[in-house]
Every structure is written in C-alpha cells, then in structure tokens.
C-alpha cells in the first residue's frame, strides 16, 4: 500500500483550556502552520486554534 499524503494534526485552543480538535492536512499544499477560528465549548466562544503535533 502507498504511504498516505495527509498527516494528522492537533488544533489546540489559544484560550488555554486544553481543548483541541484533530484534523488532517496535506503538508505539500499547506506548508505553513494552520490557524483557524473555531468553537471552544469550555469557554463557550469562538477562539483561535493553532496547529500542534499529535503526541
């Protein structure tokens, strides 16, 4: 089987709640780190989520 082109990443909340989303990205097309504005249920607001490695 071929090696997958996408890698799994964590999107960690910038509100320091410890909440994160897991998603995938293609590192060939998206070379810079992802930064998305998503919902954080701990603070019940939309906050910035930044890319981090999955441990």
UniProtKB/Swiss-Prot annotation:
UniProt keyword annotations, A-Z: Ribonucleoprotein, Ribosomal protein
Entry GO CC: cytosolic large ribosomal subunit
PROSITE patterns with a match to the protein in the record: RIBOSOMAL_L33
Could you tell me the Gene Ontology terms of the biological process aspect for this record?
translation
Query: Which Pfam families does the record cross-reference, listed alphabetically?
Result: Ribosomal_L33 (PF00471)
Q: One MF term from GO for this chain?
A: structural constituent of ribosome
Coiled-coil positions are none
Do the record's keywords include 4Fe-4S? Answer: no
Source organism, top-level taxon: Bacteria
Q: Does the record's keyword annotation contain Repeat?
A: no
NCBIfam families assigned to the protein according to its UniProt record, in alphabetical order: PRK00595.1, rpmG_bact
The UniProt family comment states: Belongs to the bacterial ribosomal protein bL33 family.
Looking up PANTHER family in the UniProt record yields: 54S RIBOSOMAL PROTEIN L39, MITOCHONDRIAL, LARGE RIBOSOMAL SUBUNIT PROTEIN BL33M
Its recorded name reads Large ribosomal subunit protein bL33
**Can you name the source organism?**
Zymomonas mobilis subsp. mobilis (strain ATCC 31821 / ZM4 / CP4)
Could you tell me the gene encoding this protein?
A: rpmG
